[in-house]
Amino acid sequence: MLEQLQTLKSEAETQIKEASDLKTLNDLRVKYLGKKGPMTEIMKQMGKLSAEEKPKMGSLANEVRTALTKAITGKQQILETEAINEKLKAETIDITLPGTAPSIGTKHLLTQVIEEMEDMFIGMGYEIAEGPEVELDYYNFEALNLPKDHPARDMQDSFYITENTLLRTQTSPVQARTMEKHDFSKGPIKVICPGKVYRRDNDDATHSHQFTQIEGLVVGENITFADLKGTLTVLAKTMFGEEREIRLRPSFFPFTEPSVEMDISCFKCGGKGCRVCKGTGWIEILGSGMVHPNVLEMSGIDSTRYSGFAFGLGPERVAMLKYAVDDIRHLYTNDLRFTKQFQSTETGEI
């Protein structure tokens, strides 16, 4: 039995030393120290020994078990340390490499178009006027010659908050508020009103329940239709190119009389007819007209002394036409791949 223990110890220590991974080491633990291992078998044979041999062989067996346990524990620590070092080596971050830079936003295409128009009108002596987006029914409709139950209200399905308040459907209420408080001793009214508006439209490629408008208003003495036409001509040439021609078509808006819609000669085909202009050679841009006398009177302005014109257009439509954007939803999805295409846009050609 003595020789058996010595052979077992030598063989086990050699295999433990050569173990290359934790699984192999655990298998050796089970092989030599497990319930079915040789050490267990040796301990069972102790009962066959004489009374003199039992203490000696029992002590030796315990020494072998302790030595093997110590060898396995030591080897386990070595293998665990090596495994940790390998993992750290594999997961090491090279801090000298450049990091992944976060995506940086740019000035939105709509913002650029709005600012371009604002700069143009400011250069013509206009001021920028703003008003609440949650508006009174009176300013959104009644002050603009749209009394309650007027059939023209059906043209603008609205988001009502209470019976008398709603999300504005146009920036025209800003014009009504401006006219109410204006002092003509300081000169005529010349304002543009940019801002968000809301209508109950189903979102699709050309419609959105929220969009932006820029409306213009000029009121003073001796303001004529010729002034309106000249202003719209400057707008068309500034935004779409000096070679643009304009066409005014009779239309109807409750707050202007007479009312016209402005078309520009197609910047894509030069008026020959193409997909953009639907073969007509003209593209509809905005609505406009001379301020209705009723609107002036409701704002406390003497319509026999003062006259004016107003116009309104959507920056989204301008942006889509000018930069060939085929879906209005692209302007609102915050996709940097889209917005970064326009970080260097300039006035003029597409």
Swiss-Prot record:
It comes from Listeria welshimeri serovar 6b (strain ATCC 35897 / DSM 20650 / CCUG 15529 / CIP 8149 / NCTC 11857 / SLCC 5334 / V8). SUPFAM superfamilies: Class II aaRS and biotin synthetases (SSF55681), tRNA-binding arm (SSF46589). Pfam families: Phe_tRNA-synt_N (PF02912), tRNA-synt_2d (PF01409). InterPro entries: aa-tRNA-synth_II (IPR006195), aa-tRNA-synth_II/BPL/LPL (IPR045864), Phe-tRNA-synth_IIc_asu (IPR004529), Phe-tRNA_ligase_II_N (IPR004188), Phe_tRNA_ligase_alpha1_bac (IPR022911), Phenylalanyl-tRNA_Synthase (IPR002319), tRNA-bd_arm (IPR010978). Its cofactor is Mg(2+). CDD domains: PheRS_alpha_core. Keywords: Aminoacyl-tRNA synthetase, ATP-binding, Cytoplasm, Ligase, Magnesium, Metal-binding, Nucleotide-binding, Protein biosynthesis. It comes from the Bacteria. HAMAP family: Phe_tRNA_synth_alpha1. This is Phenylalanine--tRNA ligase alpha subunit.
